[in-house]
Structure formats: C-alpha cells, structure tokens
Amino acid sequence: RWREKNKDAFFRREGVKLTYMPVITEAVAKALAAYPQVNVSVDGYNILFKKHINVGIAVSLNDGNLIVPVVHDADHLNLNGLAVAIDSLALKARDNKLMPEDIDGGTFTITNFGTFKSLFGTPIINQPQVAILGVGYIEKKPAVIETPEGDTIAIRHKMYLSLSYDHRVVDGMLGGNFLHFIADYLENWQG
C-alpha cells in the first residue's frame, strides 16, 4: 500500500522508480550496524571486521548472468539516497558501464529471486563475505492478526527471507537474530 501511494510522487521527485529494494537495503544496513559480527570477511584463518557497511545488490543482466554492484556506506544513505544509488548501479550494470569501484568492497550481499516470482531460495555466499540475504516474491496471503480483542484473519503481503551464512563465523543464534532484526524492521516499517 505504501509503495502504491508514493510511487508516482517519488518518481517525479527523484527520477527513479520506487521499489522495495531500498527499504530492504535500509533494513540490512541497520542490521549490520546492530550485528557487526556479520559485517566481516574471512581471510585464511583471520576474520576481518569491516569499518564500512557496503551492501552488494545482485543485478540480473540481459544475457542471463548476474553481477553484484555495491552501495558503499549504505548506512549513511536515507531511503531516497538508497533508491537513487540502487537504480543508478542497476542501470550501469545492464548498460555494461560499471567501473571496478562499483563492484569492489562489498561487505554483505542481497539477492532478490522474487524478481523472478520465486517465493524462496537458497542464496550462495559471495565470498569472502560471510552471509547473503535472499529475498522472495511478495504476495498476498491470509495471516492471523493478534489483537487484544482476539485473533482474526486478514490478507497481508508476505515475503520470505532466507539467510545463508558461513558457520565458521556466524552461528545459528547470530544468524537467527540477524535475520529476525531484518524481518522485524520490515514488518514494522512505517515509511
């Protein structure tokens, strides 16, 4: 509903389409700030903690391949800044105009198989990163809504998230808490 209400005005103001990816990227950036143990890479026997939160966004190319341009310092961008950055990188990727700095330095990756109407999948970690978030297709589903007056059934937009992570660094508790942070942020996001 939020996207439908705001997409035309957003396009007029920012010159880019309003998608869910900037909101998801914002949630991931906040989760990485809250759980810096996930914003690391593995170098041999060493774990390298990253100072910057640089989120890679998998972009499908016309030839069927994928490339992962990087939104540098994603935690310093607001929703508008994220939308413009993601749109710009995706266009550059599809026009084969990415520069080396556009694909370098990622500390975490998001892949959106929902673009292809897949509900969920198992993303492969973009090494040397230690985790990747997979985003599924958003569809309407019946859901139980808990209220003080009792439970009721309503139609809600649902999206599956999947997190793959390197168990040498991220255990189940950390991975579960990280994913819960993202899901909770998205479920309670006000726009």
Language-model regions, residue ranges each:
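C-terminal catalytic/motor cores of large multi-domain enzyme assemblies
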Residues: 1-191
